[in-house]
Design a protein with these regions (language model features):
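Mature extracytoplasmic/periplasmic domains
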Residues: 63, 119, 281, 316-400
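Extracytoplasmic/periplasmic substrate-recognition and gating elements
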Residues: 93, 169, 245-251, 286-353, ...
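Extracytoplasmic/periplasmic solute-binding protein
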Residues: 144-152, 157, 167, 182-229, ...
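Glycine-centered hinge/linker elements that transmit conformational signals in sensory
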Residues: 186-190, 226-255, 298
Length: 436
C-alpha cells in the first residue's frame, strides 16, 4: 500500500452509519410513504471530546430538531484514534457499513483523506461558501475548487499572560501588543530576574511552538503544492532559531505531558502561555488568578518579512460521507447549523468557549462581552479578529509523520548540529518516507 494511503489511515478522523427505513403501502400510499420515510430517517455523527465537540454537536442537534422533529440524530462519542482507524479501514476496503453520515476531522489530517478518498466525501460547495469563513480554514478542505467540509472551531494562536507578573518585571500591557519574539524574550528575561518565574513551557517532544511560528509566516513543512519543503525553508530556519533563542535565554520551563503543561500556569510557575485559544478554559480553572490574566496577539518573527501577529494550532471541520445513504439530509443538517447559524455559534461561545471560524459570528452578542477573568477584556472579539488574519497554508497529507521526524532534527540543532546540513539531510529522509 502506498504511503499516501497509509498516512491517510494514520492521519484522519472517522464516520459511523445511520439507517433509513421506508414503509407503508396502502390506498394513500404517496402521503404514507413520504411520512414514513421522513419519520424513520436517522443521521449519525461521530466526534471526540465530550466537553467540546460532542456538546457542540448535541446543541446543533437540538436546533435542527426544532424544524425537523422527524429526523433522528444520534451523536456518538469516540476517541479520535478510534475514529481514524474505523474510517480508514472502511474507506480503504470500499465498505460503508458501520460508518456515520457526518464526521469531525482535524484540519491537519483532512488533506490525506481528500487526496486518497475524494469520491467518498460529499461536495459541500452548495451549503458552505469559502467567503463566509476564515480563509485559512477553507484552504485546507478544498480539492479542485470544491469545498468538502464545513469549518468548525478556530485554533487561533494567542499570548495568554499574567498581567501582575509582567508589571512586576517593569512592563505594561501595551508592551505585550504587537510583540516580536525578540521583545518577548527581553520581557521574559526581566520576568525571570524580577519574579523567578519562567516565561513559558516547552515540551521537547512537541513542536507546537515551531508549527505556530511557521504558519505565522505563511509556511509549513510542505509548500503550496504539498511537496516537502524543509532544506530551503527560511521560515522553518527562523522558527528553529527562535525556539533555540527561547531556550538559550533561560526563560523556559520543560514539561513532558498535558498535565504538567496545565499545572505550570495554573500553579503560577510561568508568566505566559503562547498557544491556541482553546486553552482558555484551562487557564480559567485557576479561579484565584481571576483578573490577573490578559490575552494578546501571537508574536511574530521580526527577521522574517512574511511573519505576522497571527497563527493557528489545531481546529477541525465537519464532513459528510457521501455513500452512507443520507447525503442530502446530512448536508441540510450542516447547512442549518454549523454552516450558518449565528445563534448556535453565540451559544457555543458561552457554553464551551468556542471561537467560531464563521465570520458572521463576530457580530454575535457573546463576542462583545467582557470576560471578568481577563480583566473585562472582550477576548472572543479579539480571537475572531486574529482568526481572520491567520495566513493560509497547505498542511499537506503528512503533517504528523513529518513532524515526528522533524522533532529529531530540531533536537540535533539544539545540540549544536549545523542547521543547514541537518535540514538538508532531513529533506532527503522525509521525501523518502512519504514517497513509499
Amino acid at each position: 500500500m502506498k504511503m499516501k494511503k497509509v498516512l491517510a489511515i494514520l492521519l484522519a478522523g472517522a464516520m459511523t452509519f445511520g439507517l433509513m427505513a421506508c414503509s407503508g403501502s396502502d390506498s394513500k400510499e404517496t402521503d404514507s410513504k413520504d411520512t414514513a420515510a421522513k419519520s424513520d430517517e436517522k443521521l449519525t455523527i461521530w466526534a471526540w471530546d465530550e466537553s467540546f465537540n460532542i456538546k457542540a454537536a448535541n446543541e446543533a442537534k437540538e436546533i435542527y430538531a426544532e424544524k425537523n422533529p422527524d429526523v433522528e440524530v444520534e451523536v456518538v462519542t469516540m476517541a479520535q484514534d478510534d475514529i481514524v482507524a474505523k474510517l480508514n479501514t472502511s474507506l480503504s476496503s470500499g465498505s460503508y457499513d458501520g460508518l456515520p453520515d457526518i464526521v469531525l476531522i482535524e484540519d491537519y489530517r483532512i488533506q490525506g483523506y481528500l487526496n486518497a478518498y475524494q469520491d467518498d466525501f460529499s461536495d459541500l460547495s452548495d451549503i458552505a461558501s469559502a467567503g463566509d469563513f476564515a480563509e485559512y480554514k477553507t484552504g485546507v478542505n478544498q480539492i479542485d475548487g470544491k469545498i468538502y467540509g464545513v469549518p468548525f472551531d478556530s485554533g487561533v494562536a494567542a499570548m495568554f499572560y499574567r498581567t501582575d507578573l509582567i508589571e512586576e518585571a517593569g512592563y505594561t500591557q501595551d508592551d505585550m501588543n504587537d510583540l516580536t519574539w525578540d521583545k518577548y524574550i527581553e520581557i521574559g528575561k526581566a520576568v525571570k530576574e524580577k519574579t523567578g518565574k519562567a516565561m513559558l513551557t516547552l515540551d521537547p517532544s512537541d513542536l507546537g511552538q515551531i508549527r505556530m511560528m511557521l504558519q505565522s509566516a505563511g509556511a509549513w513543512y510542505t509548500d503550496a503544492d504539498g511537496k516537502v519543503d524543509i532544506a530551503d525553508n527560511q521560515a522553518l530556519k527562523d522558527a528553529i532559531t527562535t525556539y533555540k533563542n527561547l531556550v538559550d535565554a533561560g526563560i523556559t520551563k520543560t514539561t513532558s505531558d498535558w498535565d504538567q503543561f496545565v499545572g505550570a500556569f495554573n500553579n503560577g510557575e510561568v508568566a505566559s502561555v503562547p498557544t491556541g485559544c482553546w486553552i482558555s478554559p484551562s487557564v480559567m480553572k485557576a479561579e484565584d488568578q481571576s483578573g490577573k490574566w490578559a490575552v494578546a496577539a501571537f508574536p511574530k518573527m521580526a527577521e522574517n518579512p512574511d511573519s505576522v501577529n497571527a497563527s493557528s494550532i489545531g481546529g477541525a471541520g465537519w464532513y459528510v460521507l457521501k455513500n452512507v445513504g443520507h447525503e442530502d439530509t446530512a448536508k441540510e443538517f450542516l447547512k442549518e447549523t454549523f454552516a450558518s447559524n449565528i445563534d448556535l455559534m453565540n451559544q457555543l461561545a458561552a457554553d464551551i468557549n468556542l471561537v467560531s471560524t464563521l465570520k458572521a459570528s463576530s457580530e454575535a452578542e457573546n463576542y462583545s462581552k467582557g470576560v471578568e477573568f481577563y480583566g473585562g477584556q472582550e477576548i472572543f472579539g479579539d480571537f475572531a479578529e486574529w482568526t481572520n488574519e491567520v495566513p493560509s497554508v497547505n498542511y499537506g497529507e503528512n503533517t504528523y509523520a513529518i513532524e515526528d521526524m522533524m522533532t529529531e532534527a530540531v533536537q540535533a540543532v539544539m545540540g549544536g548540529a549545523d542547521m543547514d546540513k541537518t535540514l538538508t539531510d532531513y529533506q532527503t529522509q522525509v521525501e523518502a518516507a512519504v514517497a513509499q
